Amino acid sequence: MFRTTFTALLAAAGAILADDIQDAPGSGTVTPLLTQALAGIEGKEVSMVTVTYPPGGASSAHRHNADVFVYVLEGSVVMQVDGGAPVTLEAGQAFHESPSDVHRVSRNASDTKPAKILAILVKDQGAPATVPAS
């Protein structure tokens, strides 16, 4: 019984996180992998998701209520936060966003191949992972 309830709660949390992160159509497919409270850091949790961008896919401007660590798994992506230049990252490269960064550009660098990233978000428990840029 506990295992079934726990599994259902994890699935629901993953669905909520995916809704939090996913933007408009073409922005990418978010796949929740894990959300876990951090032992020894009261009130904080880590969430891991993959985001797969279709060819030419992009997200609208947004901000995360989290420190976000991005690792490019496949393809290449272009990232830009306010005050910084656009950066093109290839598979095997990483990127960091702080909670105060407005993420202006997050897109697949290719119009012909998909791109996939792993995002690890460290945030307050229960806080939305993503909010629109203001």
Regions found by a protein language model. Name each.
Residues I41-G43, R63, T88, A109-P114:
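Extracellular/periplasmic catalytic domains that process cell-envelope and extracellular macromolecules
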Residues P86, S100-G126:
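Ligand-binding loop in jelly-roll beta-barrel domains
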Residues A58-S60, V78, F95, P99-N108:
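Histidine-centered metal-chelating micro-motifs
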Residues G43-M48, D67, G84, S100, ...:
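Extracytoplasmic
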Residues F2-S47, Q80, H96, P114, ...:
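A short, N-terminal "cap"/entry segment at the start of jelly-roll beta-barrel domains
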Residues Y53, G83-S100:
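Short acidic-glycine-tyrosine-enriched beta hairpin
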Residues A66-G83, Q93:
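Glycine- and acidic-residue-biased ligand/ion/polar-headgroup-sensing regions
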Residues K44, G56-Y71:
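A short beta-loop-beta micro-motif enriched in histidine and acidic residues
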